[in-house]
Amino acid sequence: MNHLQQRQLFLENLLVGVNNTFHQMQKHSINTCCQSLQKILDHLILLQTIHSPAFRLDRMQLRQMQTLACLWIHQHNHDHQAMLGAIKWISPLIKELR
């Protein structure tokens, strides 16, 4: 297994763990607006990467960041500044993929 494959496997496992945590929290405390926010971020990622030569690994990293951004925004009670900060956090990576 080469370095890229090891990195991809590690990130896939990390993503599974983050998603499991997110979905467990979702059952207990995350409401519809968080689900809507996740759909918006997901759409943003898809639009920015659909015509680019982004590897699966790059998309996976963005989706992991998206999940963490949703958790961050929820923990800050959907504060507008927290939302803007999270989107800016994701956006630089999206621009690199173009």
Curated annotation (Swiss-Prot):
Q: Which subcellular locations apply to this protein?
A: Host cytoplasm; Host mitochondrion
Q: Which domain of life is it from?
A: Viruses
Q: Which GO terms describe its cellular component?
A: host cell mitochondrion
Keyword rRNA-binding assigned = no
Instruction: Quote the InterPro entries the UniProt record gives.
Output: Rotavirus_NSP6
Electron transport: is it a keyword of this entry? no
Q: Which cysteines are joined by disulfide bonds?
A: none
Entry keywords, A to Z: Host cytoplasm, Host mitochondrion
Subunit structure, as described in the record: Interacts with NSP2 and NSP5.
Family that this chain belongs to: Belongs to the rotavirus A NSP6 family.
Annotated protein name in UniProt = Non-structural protein 6
Species, as recorded: Rotavirus A (isolate RVA/Human/United Kingdom/A64/1987/G10P11[14]) (RV-A)
